Amino acid sequence: MDRAVSQVALENDEREAKNTWRLIFRIAILFLTVVTLAISVASLLYSMGASTPSDLVGIPTRISRAEEKITSTLGSNQDVVDRIYKQVALESPLALLNTETTIMNAITSLSYQINGAANNSGWGAPIHDPDYIGGIGKELIVDDASDVTSFYPSAFQEHLNFIPAPTTGSGCTRIPSFDMSATHYCYTHNVILSGCRDHLHSHQYLALGVLRTSATGRVFFSTLRSINLDDTQNRKSCSVSATPLGCDMLCSKATETEEEDYNSAVPTRMVHGRLGFDGQYHEKDLDVTTLFGDWVANYPGVGGGSFIDSRVWFSVYGGLKPNTPSDTVQEGKYVIYKRYNDTCPDEQDYQIRMAKSSYKPGRFGGKRIQQAILSIKVSTSLGEDPVLTVPPNTVTLMGAEGRILTVGTSHFLYQRGSSYFSPALLYPMTVSNKTATLHSPYTFNAFTRPGSIPCQASARCPNSCVTGVYTDPYPLIFYRNHTLRGVFGTMLDGEQARLNPASAVFDSTSRSRITRVSSSSIKAAYTTSTCFKVVKTNKTYCLSIAEISNTLFGEFRIVPLLVEILKDDGVREARSG
């Protein structure tokens, strides 16, 4: 029995010894594992340079900085992508479209000329320098945000004078008309040898030219063809337009004073003429007895015409024969336009009565003075398919001199402020089926003209008068949706007298800093303005052709005043020049 007990005790001792060695082994393994792990962590921290806990605190900051760098890089890349998109999707197609338009205009002009050459009617293909491609007849400044009057004219720039001046003290050059297409420009004025008041004898100067850039980068107007119509005809109130066949001109032929003409019983003789690219001039009488059968006097608007849809469009005005269909359809019609923030205090009924009377001023025997638009098909045959549009007097004021303008895809009629309303007016015009429709006008309250009382520059109430002066505005600044924002022009900055010509940019209520021709006492008269861009330099220029007093050689000298349009912020009414 003792032996059995000893055997059991021995087995227990062996089992206990095994458990002890197992524990020692496990502890050793665990110790080695911990040591190995500690060495590995130490090595890793050493290799990362993060040997202290304070280094770990900076890790989030470093991550944030890295994130900012990545975001900035992505943002820069996005800017590049945006610029590429703008260039590819917007600017390049627009540039191509402008180039295409100019090429198509040139091709159209050439096709007309080829047909003309086949009919022995001349040959030639003038075109502006490439620097101007896409910069003529376009929306030159498209800006939704800037103050319109932050754009302003520079001082007048010296350039080549393309307009002949009087050469004697009794000479007189007056009534300039100008129009410029994508390929060439046209200019005309009246020449009187014995003083500006001679209404029976005159010549008509007519010229065709192109825009050039000099070797030093200066703009100049280069006359290629010109003619002085020195014959027995007395052309008056001529309007000119640049068309694919040259320079089309509409004139009346006067044999009496304006007052005598309005008191006559028959319409005024009118001719459609053309200076071709070959330098030859031809003209044809219009059938005024049919075209102006209800009129006793009819004159072109003096301002330039416009080539639209294969036709040339001119502003015309004159007197209607009483009780004819054209006269009776306007009976009782009127429109009242109001000054900005300066309401007429007269009773409404009185205003309406005076507005109605304004269309029949006493100076012209009580005839209704009517606005109209004449379009003529442009072909090798002059005077082809003339169509007269007479707009309702619920839109237009008393008939007056005017101009048809095309800028981009928009058409406008400027109407001289011969009636009571002093601020410049531009009527939007739509064209369809050879006729035109006028819409409510843009008005430019600070772009006034001098006039006799009660229709002076500050006048605000309807009245009957024949006054004012021709000073057209040119559409310069547009919204991106093609709505007109601002114009450029040269106004006569006087209340009653034709004094102080001053150029500026105008919005509907105010004007920019101005550039004066000279002191406030200088005498002036008609001004007509046109703007364009030198695409190569992205500089915008405006040309104002102005009648300026010139007492030594003739009563007036017609001067082409050239300015660059500059940009400033918050500057108004500064004096320059």
Swiss-Prot record:
Glycosylation (residues): 119, 341, 433, 481, 538
Keyword match Glycoprotein: yes
Gene3D superfamilies per record: 2.120.10.10
GO cellular component: host cell plasma membrane; membrane; viral envelope; virion membrane
EC numbers on record: 3.2.1.18
Ranges annotated as spanning the membrane: 27-47
Compartments, record wording: Virion membrane; Host cell membrane
Source organism superkingdom: Viruses
BP GO annotations: symbiont entry into host cell; virion attachment to host cell
Region of interest called Involved in neuraminidase activity, as start-end residue ranges on this chain: 234-239
Membrane topology summary: Single-pass type II membrane protein
InterPro entries (alphabetical): Hemagglutn-neuramid, Hemagglutn/HN, Sialidase_sf
Catalytic activity: Hydrolysis of alpha-(2->3)-, alpha-(2->6)-, alpha-(2->8)- glycosidic linkages of terminal sialic acid residues in oligosaccharides, glycoproteins, glycolipids, colominic acid and synthetic substrates
Major location (coarse): virion
Residue ranges annotated as Intravirion topological domain: 1-26
Listed Pfam families: HN
A GO molecular function held by the record: host cell surface receptor binding
UniProt KW keywords: Disulfide bond, Glycoprotein, Hemagglutinin, Host cell membrane, Host membrane, Host-virus interaction, Hydrolase, Membrane, Signal-anchor, Transmembrane, Transmembrane helix, Viral attachment to host cell, Viral envelope protein, Virion, Virus entry into host cell
Region (Important for interaction with fusion/F protein): 124-152
Recorded domain comment: The C-terminus (head domain) is involved in binding the cellular receptor.
Family: Belongs to the paramyxoviruses hemagglutinin-neuraminidase family.
Protein task: Mediates the viral entry into the host cell together with fusion/F protein. Attaches the virus to sialic acid-containing cell receptors and thereby initiates infection. Binding of HN protein to the receptor induces a conformational change that allows the F protein to trigger virion/cell membranes fusion. Neuraminidase activity ensures the efficient spread of the virus by dissociating the mature virions from the neuraminic acid containing glycoproteins.
Protein name: Hemagglutinin-neuraminidase
Organism: Newcastle disease virus (strain B1-Hitchner/47)
Lineage, top ranks: Viruses, Riboviria, Orthornavirae, Negarnaviricota, Haploviricotina
